[in-house]
Amino acid sequence: MAVYYPNSVGMQSLYQESIYLNEQQQQQQQASSSSAASFSEIVSGDVRNNEMVFIPPTSDVAVNGNVTVSSNDLSFHGGGLSLSLGNQIQSAVSVSPFQYHYQNLSNQLSYNNLNPSTMSDENGKSLSVHQHHSDQILPSSVYNNNGNNGVGFYNNYRYETSGFVSSVLRSRYLKPTQQLLDEVVSVRKDLKLGNKKMKNDKGQDFHNGSSDNITEDDKSQSQELSPSERQELQSKKSKLLTMVDEVDKRYNQYHHQMEALASSFEMVTGLGAAKPYTSVALNRISRHFRCLRDAIKEQIQVIRGKLGERETSDEQGERIPRLRYLDQRLRQQRALHQQLGMVRPAWRPQRGLPENSVSILRAWLFEHFLHPYPKESEKIMLSKQTGLSKNQVANWFINARVRLWKPMIEEMYKEEFGESAELLSNSNQDTKKMQETSQLKHEDSSSSQQQNQGNNNNNIPYTSDAEQNLVFADPKPDRATTGDYDSLMNYHGFGIDDYNRYVGLGNQQDGRYSNPHQLHDFVV
C-alpha cells in the first residue's frame, strides 16, 4: 500500500513510496497513539494485500500524533524505498478530508527488488517504520508537532530521468527480457560460442575438410559391373562433380559480395565495424553450403565405392575439385596405356615437366583464360599441387602465354574480325598498286621531258650562264631518277645528226606556231 505526502514547503509534485505488507513483523511490533481519523474512512471496504491508495491532499496535512521516523529506520537500496503494512490498518495520522487526484500517475513508478521493510500498527495507536539488511542509510526528517504541526518529508529521488533509469535497472523483468533478447539477437554470445561449437558441429566452415564416411566394408562389397553400368556411374559421378563445382562457385560469389558490402560499410563506419553484423550471416550461410556440399560428396563416395575407386589423403584435402577430376582421369588413362603396352620405356629420359603437373597448370590456365597471371599465393598453391618449384610454375606460365595463349587469342581475333581485315588488306594492296603505276608513269614522263630539254639545249652554240642554269636545272629535283642521271653522264657531245634533227624539228614547230588557226590544238 502506498501513501503520497506533500512537502510542507508547498511542492506541487506528488511522490510515491512503495509499501509492502509483512504479516510476520506486524505481530512483533506494537505502538500507541491517538488518531482522529482512520484509513477506513478513506478507503471503503477491506484493504487487500499490495493494494495502493493514492492520497494527494489539496492542503497541508495536520498530524496530531507523534509519528517519528528516524534516519536509522529508513533505508535506501538501489534508489527505492520499500515499506510493509499489515492487512488491517488503522491510521494514527489525523488527516483532513481528502480528495483523489490522478494527475501524474504515469510518471510515478514503483520500485521492486528491494530489501523488505516493515510497517505495522496495532490498536490504531502508532505507526513505525523499520527496514533490515540495508546497504545505505537514507537520511530522513522528523515528523513532529512542534506547535506548527508541520510535516517534514525528505525526498531522495525527485528527478524523473534518474528514477526511470534506476527503476528499469532494478526491475524484476529486466533479466527475463535480456534472456529473450539474447536468444533472438545475441551477437556476442554467438561469436564467443561459435568457435567452440564449430569444432564439434558437423556444419563447419565451408573451406574446412569434411569427413568422408566410407568404410572398408562398402569398398569390399563392390561387385563386378557391366560396361554400361560403369559408364552410367561415371556419368553420374561427373554430374555430381559439376554440382560440387557449382556449389563452390556460388559460395565464392556470395563470399565476395559480402566482403564488398562489408568494405563499403567499413568505409563509412570504420575498420572492423561490419564484423558483428556479417560474421553470423557468413557462418550460417557457410554451414548451409557445407551441408549441401557434404551431401553431394557422400553420393560421390557411394559411386566411387561401387566403382572400386579409392581416394588418397591429398585428394581429400584438395580444394579444387576440377583439378582432382583431371588428375583422376590422367591416372585412368595411364592405367589404360599400361594395359595396352603404350607406356614410355623407363630408360628413356623424360623431357620437360611431368604430364600430371602440366595438366594441372593447363587446367588453371584455361580456368583463368581472360587473365592468366597467377598471384604469388596461387603460384605457391600450384607448386604444392604439382610438386614443382615456384620458379618452374612461373616459367611455365611465361612460356604458355607466349606459345599457347597468344596464338589462341590471335585466332579468335581473326575469326571475329577476319572478313573486315581481309577487305582492308585488299583495299590497301589496290591503293599501293595504283600509287606505284602512277609514280612510274610520272617518272617516265619526267625523264622524256628532261631528255628533250637536254637535246634542245645542246643545239644552242652560245648561251649565257643564266640560260645554262635554266636549261640544266631539274624542275622537280625530288623526283629525279638514276636513269636521268645516267643519261646526263653518258652525254659525249653534239653531232651533225643531232643538229639536222634539231633544225628539222624547229622548222616544223615554226610552221605550226606561224599559223594562228592551229593554236587550239595546244589549248588544254
Swiss-Prot record:
Skewed-composition ranges (Low complexity): 446-459
A GO term for molecular function: DNA-binding transcription factor activity
Cysteines engaged in disulfide bonds, as pairs: none
Residue ranges of DNA binding: 346-408
Keywords: DNA-binding, Homeobox, Nucleus, Transcription, Transcription regulation
Similarity comment: family membership: Belongs to the TALE/BELL homeobox family.
Domain notes: The SR/KY and BELL domains are responsive for the interaction between the TALE/BELL proteins and the TALE/KNOX proteins.
The protein, known as: BEL1-like homeodomain protein 3
Lineage of producing organism: Eukaryota, Viridiplantae, Streptophyta, Embryophyta, Tracheophyta
Gene: BLH3
